[in-house]
Structures are given as C-alpha cells and as structure tokens.
Amino acid sequence: MGKEEISTTKYLIHAQINANGIVEKPDVVGAIFGQTEGLLSNDLDLREFQKTGRIGRIKVNITSRGGKSKGEIIIPSSLDRVETAILAASLETINRVGPCEAYIQVTKVEDVRAVKRKRVVERAKEIYASMMEEVTPESLKMIEEVKEAMRVHEITEYGEEKLPAGPNVETSDAILVVEGRSDVLNLLKYGIKNAIAVEGVSVPKTVADLTRKKTVTAFVDGDRGGELILKELLQVGEIDYVTRAPKGKEVEDLEKDEIMMALRNKVPVEQFYHDLGMKKEKKKTEDKMVLLRNILKELEGTGNAEILDDALNILREVKVENLYDELSRVNNHPYAVVFDGVITQRLVDLSFEKGLRYLVAVRSGDIVKKPHNLKLITGHT
C-alpha cells in the first residue's frame, strides 16, 4: 500500500483463506470484488470504496501445497468502525475462488491508530530515558537543591506553637497530622500542602483544636514512635481517619507511590479500633450524647438555646430566634449547641464554620449538605 493509504488508514482487516485447489492472488482479489458486489447496498459497494480511496489496495499472501491453497488477506480501511465491521463480515460469505471451493475467516480487525499510539508511547519512553542519561549528577544535584529550596519556602508556621505546616492547612477542610517538620517537607515535595506536624509525642493545643474543626487524618510512622503519637492523638484530638507508613518506615522517607498508597488505604477511626482489637473510648462520647439529650429535654417548650463548650458548660444561653446571630459572635471554641427548635441548613453551615461537633434540636429540616465531622441529634433519633 502507498504512503497515502498508510496515512489515512484507520483499520486493517486480517482474514485467513483456505481453498480446495490451486489459486493465485488475482483469483482471490477477483472473488472478493465479484462475490460481494450487490450483496450490500450501493452505499457499501467495495468497488466504490476503492475508487474513492476509502479502502486501500487488497494485499494477498497465498501459497499452494498438495493441491490446496492457504493464505492471508489484508484490507486497509479508512471507513468508520461499523462500516469496517460490515465489510469484514461480507468477506466470510465468499465460498468460491476461481473454480475452487474456498473458505474465508476474519481473524482480527486491527486499529491502526491504537498501534500508532502505542508506538508513540514506547518511543517517548526511549527519548525520555536518553534525555535523563544526558543529565549529569551535578545537574541533578542542582535541580534537587532548587526543589528543596522551594519546599522550604512553602512551609509555614502555624498556631501559637509555630508548628511546621503546609500552606493550605488554614483553608483546607481536611488536614493530615504528621510527626515532624521533615514529614511536612516530604509531603510538600509531592504536592501535598495540608499537613501539620505535632513536633513530638505530646499533641499541641493548636492541633487538638484543629481536630474539632476539620476532617483529620493521622499519618504516622510505621514504628513504635508512630504508635505513641497515634495513641496521644486519639486521646486528645478528634481523629476521623488513620493511616501509617509501611512497617519500619518513616513518613519523611516515603516515595510518592508509597505516600499515595498509604492515603488511599486510610481507614475510619472506628475501623482502626476494630481491626487492632483496641478498646475504643466510646464511653466518653456516649455519655456526652446522653447528657446532650437530657439538656434537650430540659429545653423543650422553653424556646431557648444553649451554646456549650467541650465540657458541656454553658458559654451562652439565648432565645432560639437569636441563636444564629449569637452563635456568629461566639469566638471561644463552641463545642455543641442544644436548642428548642428545628435544625436548618443555614444553621448547619454556620456550625461547621464554628467547628461545632454536635448540633442538637427537637427535630431537623431538610438538610442537603451535612459536614462529615458535625453530628446532628434530634429528639426523634
């Protein structure tokens, strides 16, 4: 086939031919045109397709032995997928070639463009590899120094304790809590900008407060130190997910694929407790929920609302109609709101902004968007 055919061909029809007699290429080509003529509509006429260049020159490789012939037929096609399939199927209706009985079977229809794409990918790999070979160790060192400088430039200090953190910790709804500065730097290296470090086994107040406002994944080392930090986090903070570096490895040493695998394999904290056979500290949470329900019973029928801290002490007591405005003005870390009224989407959104963990009311309206770390409790649930 010519250069023009190669450039426009979309598919190659491959077929196997067997004939009970000695036949040659012109016989096969003649049979293809002769026996498919009139078989289909004029729109699918093989001769017309070849005249207009929509199929290329038919290639036939055939050999004869022992009074029988066997070979391969290849037909280039620039038709669409459906037309090519119909053309391929029509070949199998041919039952004679010249004076001989014959049988044709389509073995495959090859997508030429897919083959070209594969070649492009393979060649691109080769070119890239050769480019990398030309990069000198000095150049690699220089590149790494620039990358390291950029990572250090991106790292920030967060909270009163000036904890090492990525630039997105403040604005992101979800954060990663890691052990140290090196962990944050390594995550920045791979574009993860919402990590904050505890910088030791003791969990800082800033991190504990963040766990009440955001969806938090604890990402710790796969060693004893990681276990200790995780236990402290689970006691002091409100962790949503847990993941660990592979056993014996530290987060600061992980490659990109190891980090992504660990984050994909994170588990809800409830499952973490269950999988490790650890005792989950449910009692404290369950006791709080009982107390919150009791407070709701006391408030029913009063038209009042109470804004509470994490010890369930009253920060502010207001009328329900003033609740939204009063909650907007509260800045000393409200933990829960209990009120004699109906939970609305507007109030849910504000509660999430304020970092509340519980919103308790007589009943709930139609809530379309419920934050993961805000629990809604009503008198009917």
From Swiss-Prot:
Q: Name one GO cellular component term.
A: exosome (RNase complex)
Q: GO terms for biological process? A: DNA replication, synthesis of primer
Any one Pfam family here would be: Toprim_4
Could you say which residues bind Mg(2+) 1 here? 179, 221
- Function, in words: RNA polymerase that catalyzes the synthesis of short RNA molecules used as primers for DNA polymerase during DNA replication. Also part of the exosome, which is a complex involved in RNA degradation. Acts as a poly(A)-binding protein that enhances the interaction between heteromeric, adenine-rich transcripts and the exosome.
In which domain of life is the source organism classified?
A: Archaea
Q: Which HAMAP family match?
A: DNA_primase_DnaG_arc (MF_00007)
- Gene3D superfamilies cross-referenced by the UniProt entry: 3.40.1360.10
For this chain, one GO molecular function annotation is: metal ion binding
Which source organism? Methanothermobacter thermautotrophicus (strain ATCC 29096 / DSM 1053 / JCM 10044 / NBRC 100330 / Delta H) (Methanobacterium thermoautotrophicum)
- InterPro entries the record matches: DnaG_primase (IPR050219), Primase_DnaG_arc (IPR020607), TOPRIM_DnaG/twinkle (IPR034154), TOPRIM_dom (IPR006171)
Entry annotated with the keyword Metal-binding: yes
Q: List keywords of the entry alphabetically.
A: DNA replication, DNA-directed RNA polymerase, Exosome, Magnesium, Metal-binding, Nucleotidyltransferase, Primosome, Transcription, Transferase
Cofactor(s) needed, names only, are: Mg(2+)
Ranges where the Toprim domain occurs: 173-259
Binding, Mg(2+) 2: 221, 223
**What EC number(s) would the UniProt record show?**
2.7.7.101
Catalytic reactions on record: ssDNA + n NTP = ssDNA/pppN(pN)n-1 hybrid + (n-1) diphosphate
Instruction: Give the cofactor note.
Output: Binds two Mg(2+) per subunit.
Q: Write down what this protein is called.
A: DNA primase DnaG
Q: Does the keyword Lipid metabolism apply?
A: no
Q: How does it assemble?
A: Forms a ternary complex with MCM helicase and DNA. Component of the archaeal exosome complex.
Similarity section: Belongs to the archaeal DnaG primase family.
